[in-house]
Swiss-Prot record:
Molecular-function annotations in GO: structural constituent of ribosome
Family to which the UniProt record says this protein belongs: Belongs to the bacterial ribosomal protein bL27 family.
Record key words, sorted: Ribonucleoprotein, Ribosomal protein
UniProt cross-references to Gene3D superfamilies, sorted A to Z: 2.40.50.100
Designated name of the protein: Large ribosomal subunit protein bL27
Region feature (Disordered): 1-20
GO BP terms: translation
Segments of skewed composition (Gly residues): 1-10
Organism the protein comes from: Verminephrobacter eiseniae (strain EF01-2)
Record PANTHER family: LARGE RIBOSOMAL SUBUNIT PROTEIN BL27M, RIBOSOMAL PROTEIN L27
Any GO CC annotation of this UniProt entry: cytosolic large ribosomal subunit
InterPro entries per UniProt: Ribosomal_bL27, Ribosomal_bL27_CS
Gene that this polypeptide is encoded by: rpmA
Amino acid sequence: MAQKKGGGSTRNGRDSQPKMLGVKVFGGQRITAGSIIVRQRGTRFHPGSNVGMGKDHSLFALVDGQVSFGIKGALSKPTVNVTPAASAPPV
């Protein structure tokens, strides 16, 4: 029998690129239409009024305005809303 193990290759040495997920614009901040509010995997946050969702579940503003976060429904789902700029209070 062999007294030493064969010199196999290492199983380490690789890493995935960062995905840059998370909230990009916080509550109370102004935003322009088309700007990303949240990058996420799955629906951690749900789109509310004036917010759209991309195929990768990213949330983006449909109108210029002010971002707000809230809770919606019986299941207490966190939602993201954009108040249009005309009716948004000054910051």
